[in-house]
Amino acid sequence: MNKEDFDVMILTQFNNIKYLSNYSPTSFAVCLLKEDPVILTSGMDMELAKKTSSIPIKKFESFSEIVNCFKKEGIRKIAIESSLPIDIYKKIEGNWGLEIKDFLETERMIKSDNEINKINTAIAISHKSFKELNILEKREKGATEWEVAYELGYLMRKNGASEESFETIITSGSNSSLPHAKCENKKLETPILMDWGCKFEGYCSDTSRTFVESEEQEEIFDIVLEAHDKAIDYIKPGVKVCQIDEIARSIISEYGYGENFIHSTGHSLGLDIHEKPNISKKDETILEKNMVITIEPGIYIEDKFGVRIEDMVLIDNKGVVMGDLPIN
């Protein structure tokens, strides 16, 4: 960050504030990045902020106070996040030169050792919980998609997670052809596609597994697994993420299912479940050590079934799969 680029930067995105200060706001908060950074938060959050933040905290009642402060201090140029709420933008547009600066999203791509440890813990919790669930036994007993999703969420919290990374996906039968289908109150069928994760101290995990039964399902599973494995084999520092997407996509296309691979090959994650870079054909971000990404190729045959396999990968001298959960 070049201090000459702007006089002050306004941060309102909760996870950017947590990244900088370790304070997770529960209501509206503003981080002002300048020579002496400060977090402004409501009276309701003051006690929490004082206990957790590494950046000085001040109480404020309304954003108008901040606007008046800018005027008094002679602020001329303000940097903002692209996600700045529109009501705040309207209060400052026209009075100052504004420039979008999303440098924190780039900075957050490289994880510290502490962040990697938290991610590894989240993965360990989610995988332990999955094993305790025993999905195939649940199917034999006639469990529903809803019941399995609820129990897996409970197990992750019981084992130390603060919450789920996202709404757990348990889809089966023809529902599995929808990549982000909602769980239904119906008994599990085959295949069973599961996508789940949890948070530990704010950091996310994300895993997908598919349980197949018929010969056709096994054939698709093997294609997806080949794309998954070869994409991971190609990972190393210096590689563009679009090249990884191309590897996975080309394998699936060779088998004639290119049009059935309807999402990107993966994404980065950390405090947010989806962070930069996106492992897609349009993203030319170059991999660096200590990035954490997912690899999740999938094939979805409309009204029949879908298969997705997803693992988290740490970029070291090569791609290192995080966790030890078997795929088969």
Question: For each of these PLM feature ranges, what is it?
Answer:
Residues 1-328:
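Active-site neighborhoods and metal-handling regions in enzymes and metal-associated proteins
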